[in-house]
Amino acid sequence: HLPPDVPAYRLVDKLEGESLNEAKLNEAAVLALAWSRAWNGGGAHGTVYSVKPAQVSKSAQTGEFVGKGAFVVRGQRTWYKDMDVRIGIGLIAVNGVPMVVSGTPEHVQATCPRHAVLAPGRTKKEQLANTIYRTTGLSTDELLAVLPGACDVIEEYGMLTPPAQEEE
């Protein structure tokens, strides 16, 4: 179980007393964009949309064809246009155990003292994971799980370089 302020991907059947406000929907849109094909496409901006579950169907109406593995979306879509393709990764300690987390850059910056902001780029994610491993000691498997693809580091605060030591 993670503390409530730790960014994490959660799948829930219903929200317990929480409502989805515009800020949470924007965070979900940023994450959906970062984990989509837009990341490997290398673009700096992208567009995503959201729909209600009842609007998604695997069955076709008369005269329509739906290919294997495809879905049909009917009705009004909520569009999130011209969003930055970026993701934040950060280092936190949960019950004394260091963990790497990913989320929206703003949320990770607010939660994790050691963090980095990433954008699509040319550095292979395995190479970046090895660099972070040498600095933090976290396993490369954990790091690869939070990196969406080849990326460039936009901002960095202690993830690629050791944090500054205070002199006594």
What are the residue ranges of the model-derived segments?
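Extended, highly charged segments
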Residues: 1-168
